[in-house]
Each structure stands twice: as structure tokens, then as C-alpha cells.
Amino acid sequence: LYIVEYAGWDTQSKIGKGYSSGSSAISSGGTDVMTYHTGRAYGTDGATAVQYRHIENPWGNVFDWVDGVNFNGSTVYVCTDPAKYADDTSDGYTNAGTRASSSGYISALGASTTAPWAIYPSSAGGSETTYIPDYSWTSSGWLGLAVGGDWDGGSFAGLFYFNGNNSSSNSNSNIGARHLFLLHILRRVSHTTWWKFSQQDAA
């Protein structure tokens, strides 16, 4: 959606650098007062939070872990079934292809034939002013994916920043996660509540 709206890959120049030149994490809520929910908070660019469509800090501040993606060296494994999410394994996962074998600014994205919805950096020969000006980290062994960038990511940070060189046991203070509320649970709760009150009305 961002690509359609802004017709460009450089989220830092289009919306804001995000909190990417600090020394520790900031509290959430820095963009709550914004009237339009895309942009950056008042202050020095790089030292304030950004928001995109009501999502605060999609880049900058802290990395976000991504469930359902495992790397074994350059091989990308993906899974869409939360019941099968697991670290450091390909069991229950689909081989989605091969990512960039070295770290650097992204110069190309690969599209998987086995999981057509999955894209990942396939080449890292760009710069902060060319191609996709966000960074991609890679390494050997079993690794997880964290995205967005952290408080001192600088020009590395952005909506397309792929940090794929963290072990699954990494628990540094610059890595967080986005909580997910499954809609089918909401439907179940709503249905149960409706049934409960309809029975009371019938009584």
C-alpha cells in the first residue's frame, strides 16, 4: 500500500527518518496528537517518532520480530500457520528461495515461486540513495527476522529494513514485537456475547 501511495521506496525521505539517531528506546504515544495519521512528530527529524496509517514507529525506535520467517544461511523459510511457528527449523515451513548472500543496502527483491506473496532482499549492492535505500543484514546458521530498524539505525532504517542476522534467542533491548489480535477470536467472543444476551432476552 505504501508503494502505491508514495511511488517510491525511500520511506525516510517521504515520511520521516523515524527515531533512528537516539541512544535508547522512547515510549510509545509520540504521534498521538497528530491530526492525520501519517507523518512524523514535531521536532528534529531522526529524533522523533513517525506514524504510517495509525501505526507508530514502523521503522526506528526498536526492531520488530517477525514470526513465521526463518533463515538457514541464505535460504528463506516461511510459514503462515501460527500453530506451526517455531524457531531454527524448516519443519512446517515452505522453502521460499534464496536471499542476498551478503549484507548491504538492498538493490533487488526476490519473489518466491512457492510463496508468491513473500518478497525478500535478493541482492545487496545499493546505497542509501539508490534502489531500495534500506539495509539488509545476513549471516550463516539459523536466524530470525527483525524489521524496521532501531533507535540508532540511522540511514539503515526504513519500512524495508531486513535484519536477518539475529539468533532466535536474541533478547536485546533494541528488539521488540508487534502484538497480533486474531480477528476470528473477536468473532467468537462477539458471537458468544450475542448468544448469551439473546438467551437472557428469551428468558
Stretches with model-predicted labels:
Residues 17-36, 41-42, 49, 58-71, ...:
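C-terminal, surface-exposed recognition/capping segments
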